[in-house]
Amino acid sequence: ITVVGQCIGAKDYEAVKKYTKKLMLITYGVVWAMTLLMLLFSKQILSFYSLSEETTTMTMEVFIVHGICAVIVWPLAFALPNALRAANDVRFTMIVSLLSMWIFRIGFSYVLAIYFNMGILGTWIAMCIDWFCRGACFVIRFARGKWKNISFIDN
């Protein structure tokens, strides 16, 4: 992300887009690889623990939900905002992250896990909803280019 900050300092916004896209592709590649390894070796990973059959089944469900969400939206929710922060768009990323966490991750966790009786799977689904909402906000912000006009020096 340092290179993105340098391009912003040089006001080379096409390079910012180019390097952000490149870094996002790398992030997607790493997330895909890590998720694939996690899913391929999930039984071996779980064998380190003395889990009941019910807990093992539940954990596998969580692995699958996490894996699907991670490969689709995790980079948008957690890597893309780094490019926005490099452009000094820190207030927006902080507000979106806090609101999304409190409304979607915590609020929906309660609703899905307790009210709809989904248990831990509901909590993980709520986390994926949080990632999706963050990612959508950050993609829209980056695409609109408002980050180009944020000053680095307060007057």
Residue positions per predicted region:
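Small-residue-rich hydrophobic transmembrane alpha-helices
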Residues: 1-42, 74-97
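Alpha-helical transmembrane segments of multipass membrane proteins
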Residues: 36, 79-83, 106, 110-111, ...
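Transmembrane helix-loop junction
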Residues: 6, 47-48, 61, 86, ...
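Hydrophobic transmembrane alpha-helical segments of multi-pass transport and channel proteins
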Residues: 24-36, 67-72, 102-107, 128-137
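Membrane-interface helix-loop junctions in multi-pass transport and translocation proteins
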Residues: 42-44, 57, 101-136, 143, ...
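Residue-level recognition of transmembrane alpha-helices
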Residues: 27, 63, 97-98, 124-128
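Short membrane-interface helical motifs at transmembrane helix boundaries
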Residues: 35-56, 60
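Alpha-helical transmembrane segments of multi-pass membrane proteins
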Residues: 53-77, 99
